[in-house]
Regions:
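Ligand-binding face of N-terminal immunoglobulin V-set domains in extracellular IgSF glycoproteins
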Residues: 59-164
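Residue-identity detector for glutamine
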Residues: 12, 33, 115, 129, ...
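Functionally constrained cores in energy, signaling, and assembly domains
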Residues: 5, 74, 149, 175-177
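Short, solvent-exposed beta-strand-terminating loops
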Residues: 97-99, 176-182
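N-terminal twin-arginine translocation
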Residues: 1-15
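Extended, polar beta-sheet/loop recognition surfaces of beta-rich domains
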Residues: 156-178
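Proline/serine/threonine-rich low-complexity linkers at boundaries of modular beta-sandwich domains
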Residues: 13-58
Length: 182
């Protein structure tokens, strides 16, 4: 979940003096459309071969936390099968003059490794315990919002997303819930 700070609640005429509207300022920055996935693939499901599982072992990953603050550390675990270097591009989603996102950071040619599929546990829970592929501190100037990590396998150009939230713990007018875990 993320709180969006700096917006106006219904019935408010203007922002408090000198508060600035960091979301509006961020959204006015130039964006780009390269955040979209253009080459995806899914594999048949384990129960029914006619239904895609929603995952592609070519490149897939998850984050150590789904919600972080600026200054926090974030680990991203990635598996590539077959083993392949991969690129990670991190985008903040938003209006950005209609482009939908802004590129915040790129990691080129990260070494890939095939990480084991977890066993099915009690209640059909699968708990990945993969090794981190990259770890970084969230920059202090990254404002609250939904962030996409676009993963691209070098060997096949297949792509997928990891999703995380940068949150701001100040009081806010709007709460947005993002359910990215399955």
């Amino acid at each position: 979940m993320t709180g969006l700070y700096g917006g106006r609640a219904s019935g408010q005429d203007e922002d408090p003096p000198d508060s600035g509207n960091v979301i509006a300022e961020e959204s006015a920055k130039p964006g780009e459309q390269d955040w979209r996935l253009t080459n995806t693939s899914t594999v048949p499901g384990k129960v029914n071969d006619d239904i895609a599982s929603g995952r592609s072992p070519a490149v897939e990953g998850y984050c150590s936390a789904n919600s972080v603050r600026a200054g926090d550390s974030l680990k991203i675990m990635v598996s590539t099968n077959p083993v392949s270097a991969f690129k990670l591009e991190i985008f903040r989603t938003g209006y950005y003059n209609g482009d939908g996102a802004r590129l915040m950071r790129t990691y080129d040619a990260l070494p890939g490794v095939t990480q084991l599929d977890p066993a099915i546990g009690e209640g059909y829970l699968r708990e990945c315990q993969w090794d981190p592929s990259v770890e970084f501190d969230i920059p202090e100037d990254w404002i609250s919002g939904v962030y996409l990590g676009k993963l691209t396998a070098a060997s096949s150009d297949l792509q997928s997303y990891i999703i995380f939230i940068v949150r701001d713990d100040r009081p806010c007018d709007l709460l947005f819930q993002c359910s990215e875990l399955t």
